[in-house]
Amino acid sequence: MSAAGLLEGRRICICVGAGGVGKTTTAAAIGIGMAKRGKRVAVVTIDPARRLANALGLEQLDNEPVRISAAALERLTAPDEPPLSGELWAMMLDPKQTFDELIDRLSPSPQRAAEIKRNGVYQQLSSAVAGSQEFTAIEKLYELAEADFDLLVLDTPPAHSAAEFLNAPGRLSAFLGGGALQVLLRPAGLGMRLLGVGAAPLLKALRLVTGVDLLSDLTAFFGLLGGMTEEFNARALRVQDLLRSDQTAFLLVTSAQDRPIEEAVWFRQTLRERGMPFAGAVVNRVNAPVPRGEVPLDLPTGPAFPPDLAARLDACLADHAVLAQRDATNIERLRTAFAGEPILLVPELAVDIHDAEGLLAIHRELFDE
Amino acid sequence: MSPELFSHRLIFVTGKGGVGKTTVALALGLAAAAAGRRTIVADIQGSGEQQEAELAPGLFRLSVDPQSAMDEYLLVKVPGPAAQLLRQSRLFAAFAMATPGMRELLCMGKLWELAQFERRTPDADAYDLVVVDAPASGHGAAILRTPRTFADIAQVGPIAHQAQTIAATLRDPEFTAVVAVSTAEEMPVNETLELRDALATGPDPLELQAVILNARYPDRFTTAQASAIAAALARTPAPADGVRSALSVALTEHARARREAAQAQRLSAAFGPRLLTLPYLFEPAIELPQLRRLAAELSP
């Protein structure tokens, strides 16, 4: 199975995984491969390495997809290959900008949008708060899903845990959608009466804990949002529908080390429980088994290959045999947990993965070329 | 390692995802415990040990969860009936968990509490050192700023007061140290340098006390030796699969070691004596024995 097979019939590919496993590079390599297959592809990256961005021909942060130039594409194509038949577009997510644009879109008037953007709570929310990257990444995906692309490849923000990508946007949406909070802030709200709690003592207790200013800031913020909270809620539901749709595919990216594999197994389970569509996994940087049948190996001899070099080589192979064994065991664990779902293996490569040559090499592994 | 690091009360360990923050945090904890300091390694994932559990003599572990941190806070901080009312109110829980930054503040509050000699948790013993296995750099830097941000936003009231106290602790360089973990790869090094710059800005600038270069690949072959291996590979006929793949593995490792040397050089130029290096462990898994080997490298 190759990455092309995994993505058959899908319009959205979301690369998820623990930090440091190569999500961005994988997303870029998939974009290249699908563009070679004639698709119009947009890759949404989050904070890529500068040289990776340069390899894609992206010189600066831009919050809209930019078409990769012919010159950059030439570097991403092997000399013996025909030019790309599809189109490759790429962008780097700017969370703050995406958030501002969302407010612009949903505000009843430009004045209201400007007021919201000046609000202290909003400024915190849109830049400093954990989860704003996740929230805006999905927002951007939703926006681009309306555009005329055959495939969107989303790289997800760095997080300790892959599940953060599923949880964080919901937390922010719930906040923006008001819900419990609004009931709380509207002193005579129906919710209070239903709960049988007098509003006054609860608000008094809340003031005691939060300080009055925080409460009044929040009240001001929700006052500004007004009817937009309903829009946020409706939007959050549509985004959930999009993520669950059978046009979408979550692609798990992992390395073959213990913790990322554990995380991958667990994340697969989480996706299953939430009814999220799953395409398979990519295991990066796999150490291939090294045959050490005859030790020492039947190496060249002579002055160019002194005995101490042979000894070093053997130590190197012994160490690698440990890693190869570890990787094989971990991949087996993954296979058991996946019960037949596709797993693509990308070996540890000698080339630097952050430049055009590296991207091309990874793309070849993923697409069986 | 300089004994200075271990004289702090709170060590924040952060760095890019996948560089081995947890491993390094535990190794630091083991090293401190071995030096006789009662130490706890805490993360804020809320998914591990929910109670303070002893991992090795003098070394404890805790996973801080914002919900229980909040319950604890209300229990201790809010007087009588108000606390009762708030604890029972699902609305309040929803409010607290949905308010941006509140989860982080509650976690920071708990970490701060762990580092106090006078613990507010009933019957809890004091720790000499709290090592925080913090989230990845971007989020890690944001979390360090949360108390200050809250203190500025809330201004008055118990939360503001608590946030001010925590913020003061964090900016006290005698009390708090921030340590970055990196590998000798381009992105982690970039992120370490960005973290240094991000910490240095804002109302409460912080400095990286140490940078730990984790999992440094060995420099096994000289350039001349690598050429000899490449030449041997070129001469070896294709069917000799074993020999060819063995030679290729060696060349791949050499290329990686060369790339790492260049990245290690960037860290060394930026951090000089504050840079500490831990070797790559060719082991099936990193368990207590492996952690002890790393701890020995970090011992004061």
Write out the residue ranges for each language-model feature.
Chain B
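Conserved catalytic-core segment of NTP-binding enzymes
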Residues: 2-4, 19, 23-27, 34-35, ...
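N-terminal phosphate/diphosphate-binding loop that engages ATP/GTP or pyrophosphate donors
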Residues: 30-90
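ATP-hydrolysis module of ASCE/P-loop NTPase motor domains
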Residues: 80-115
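Flexible beta-alpha connector loops of hexameric P-loop NTPases
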Residues: 67-76, 94-103, 150-158
